[in-house]
């Protein structure tokens, strides 16, 4: 099995790349792909850059050039679940865009035209992630809705609106739904795994800068533990 792993930022992929055997790096359109072995599996770790456009480009290039059997999106997110703290993990039960609105044409809020309202992760990958949780010690993990948009969320008014639109949202970030949509169109199984770097409030910019390394490391550890379950 060949596994594609995508993270947006250096702190989100650094531990994965450092842990790889026989790494070989290629850069295409400013996006870095590192192929090698991790936890006994053939992997391609991809640093996509931030946001939905670069994530879509990275995912398409990853699929076209390396043909992975599955794709895992790892990294940080803002938290919305009361039971989670910074550093805890959300495993996607579904992934949606939060900044798409074509409801005038009869679609759900967050649903892109001619696309499903929600992108559903692969059940086997989710099950493997659930089993991997036990190896993380004090880090807590839940399954939940992860929403994606091209904004860093730190405005309470915007947070309120998002929760009105997506009341079960556990986390929000800036790449997952784009990656999921590309995987959907190519027929590649996926899962999104995010560790919380902030709580999507007024303190989020400060929290993010302080905790991005911790969140990226926790998410990377979760991915490595997941690989051992495959």
Swiss-Prot record:
Any matching Pfam family: PNP_UDP_1
Pathway field: Amino-acid biosynthesis; L-methionine biosynthesis via salvage pathway; S-methyl-5-thio-alpha-D-ribose 1-phosphate from S-methyl-5'-thioadenosine (hydrolase route): step 1/2
Source superkingdom: Bacteria
Presence of the UniProt keyword Amino-acid biosynthesis in the record: yes
GO biological process: L-methionine salvage from methylthioadenosine; L-methionine salvage from S-adenosylmethionine; nucleoside catabolic process
Active site: 12, 198
Residue ranges that the Swiss-Prot or TrEMBL entry lists as coiled coil: none
InterPro entries linked to this entry: MTA_SAH_Nsdase, Nucleoside_phosphorylase_d, Nucleoside_phosphorylase_sf
Substrates-to-products reaction catalysed: S-adenosyl-L-homocysteine + H2O = S-(5-deoxy-D-ribos-5-yl)-L-homocysteine + adenine; S-methyl-5'-thioadenosine + H2O = 5-(methylsulfanyl)-D-ribose + adenine; 5'-deoxyadenosine + H2O = 5-deoxy-D-ribose + adenine
One Gene Ontology CC term in the entry: cytosol
Protein EC: 3.2.2.9
EC category: hydrolase
GO molecular-function terms, A-Z: adenosylhomocysteine nucleosidase activity; methylthioadenosine nucleosidase activity
Residues the record lists as binding substrate: 78, 153, 174-175
Keyword annotations: Amino-acid biosynthesis, Hydrolase, Methionine biosynthesis
Record SUPFAM superfamilies: Purine and uridine phosphorylases
Similarity comment: family membership: Belongs to the PNP/UDP phosphorylase family. MtnN subfamily.
Task of the protein: Catalyzes the irreversible cleavage of the glycosidic bond in both 5'-methylthioadenosine (MTA) and S-adenosylhomocysteine (SAH/AdoHcy) to adenine and the corresponding thioribose, 5'-methylthioribose and S-ribosylhomocysteine, respectively. Also cleaves 5'-deoxyadenosine, a toxic by-product of radical S-adenosylmethionine (SAM) enzymes, into 5-deoxyribose and adenine.
PANTHER family per UniProt: 5'-METHYLTHIOADENOSINE/S-ADENOSYLHOMOCYSTEINE NUCLEOSIDASE, 5'-METHYLTHIOADENOSINE_S-ADENOSYLHOMOCYSTEINE NUCLEOSIDASE
Name this polypeptide is given: 5'-methylthioadenosine/S-adenosylhomocysteine nucleosidase
Native source organism of the sequence: Shewanella halifaxensis (strain HAW-EB4)
